[in-house]
UniProtKB/Swiss-Prot annotation:
GO BP, sorted A to Z: defense response to bacterium; innate immune response
Alphabetic keyword roster: Amidation, Amphibian defense peptide, Antibiotic, Antimicrobial, Immunity, Innate immunity, Secreted
Protein's organism: Ranoidea raniformis
UniProt-listed Pfam families: Antimicrobial20
Protein name stated in the entry: Aurein-1.1
């Protein structure tokens, strides 16, 4: 979902 993308970016940094 949309939150999955946010979590992915959060783990990217």
């Amino acid at each position: 979902g949309l939150f999955d993308i946010i979590k992915k970016i959060a783990e990217s940094i």
